[in-house]
């Protein structure tokens, strides 16, 4: 997609080299799609935060679509995603991608719910902890990815065991 529409560039570095490289940035990015965001390292930092926000947005879409998929209304999720792309406050390129995935596989039955992470979310959480900045939405999104990679969760087994032990609640064996 970047090759077709250009790349959003978050450039960090000293002013002189950035000015010298401006023609390259302008060529690679769509109109208003690049910015000098600060000194050395600032570009990577802004990209890290960008990717953390992306994790959170995807998690929100995933949870909302799961709720609709489990509703009693037999909703056409691809149609709803398309609808939301026209004038809704939640419209985005990620929603366009969701609509495409739902058109191809309306209940996502061809996929496993295994979600990898590439590290940016971890780095952002570590930085947030260091700076005493709460990032609960991102933390939930990252931890949900971790959970998606477990075939059996020891924590969930422990919860079942504890509920059974203190209240006689049913367990599955």
Question: What are the roles of these predicted feature ranges?
Answer:
Residues 28-32:
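A common structural junction motif
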Residues 34-37:
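Active-site phosphate/pyrophosphate-binding segments
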């Amino acid at each position: 997609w970047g090759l077709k529409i250009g790349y959003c560039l978050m450039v960090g570095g000293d002013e002189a080299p950035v000015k010298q490289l401006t023609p390259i940035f302008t060529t690679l990015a769509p109109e208003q799609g690049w910015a000098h965001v600060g000194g050395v390292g600032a570009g990577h930092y802004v990209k890290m935060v960008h990717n953390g926000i992306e994790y959170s947005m995807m998690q929100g879409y995933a949870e909302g679509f799961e709720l609709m998929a489990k509703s009693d209304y037999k909703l056409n999720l691809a149609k709803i995603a398309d609808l939301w792309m026209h004038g809704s406050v939640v419209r985005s390129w990620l929603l366009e991608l969701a609509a495409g995935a739902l058109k191809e596989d309306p209940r996502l039955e061809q996929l496993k719910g295994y979600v990898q992470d590439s590290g940016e979310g971890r780095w952002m959480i570590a930085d947030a902890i260091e700076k005493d900045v709460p990032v609960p939405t991102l933390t939930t999104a990252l931890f949900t990815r971790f959970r998606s990679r477990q075939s059996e969760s020891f924590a969930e087994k422990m919860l079942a065991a504890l509920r059974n032990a203190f209240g006689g609640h049913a367990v599955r064996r």
